[in-house]
Curated annotation (Swiss-Prot):
InterPro entries with a match to the protein in the record: UPF0367
HAMAP family: UPF0367 (MF_01360)
Organism lineage string: Bacteria, Bacillati, Cyanobacteriota, Cyanophyceae, Oscillatoriophycideae
Similarity comment: family membership: Belongs to the UPF0367 family.
Protein name, entry field: UPF0367 protein PCC7424_2975
Domain of life per record: Bacteria
């Protein structure tokens, strides 16, 4: 399972959706980054493969960053990839 985290301006919590395979995760990543580069804001509607009822709509001009990661090992335990939990030094 691949997770796409979308970091929004002025929001400390990312919006996350999952894709079952790497190809669809990379495709979604590319479409989001293309929308971010457009001069006019665009509404991006997303669904989640893991939770089919989950839907979210985001304006492209509110996105600060997009992260694609594979959910394995420590990430599967609920930790964000690339960050240490407090007390794990």
């Amino acid at each position: 399972m691949f997770t796409i985290d979308i970091i929004l301006q002025m929001s400390p919590i990312p919006v996350s959706v999952q894709r079952k395979d790497e190809e669809s995760a990379q495709s979604l990543y590319q479409s989001i980054t293309q929308a971010m580069q457009e001069p006019n804001p665009k509404l991006i509607e997303l669904t989640c493969d893991k939770q089919p009822d989950k839907k979210v709509a985001i304006f492209s001009n509110q996105i600060s960053a997009v992260i694609v990661s594979e959910k394995t090992g420590a990430a599967a335990a609920g930790r964000a990839p690339g960050f240490l939990a407090i007390g794990e030094i």
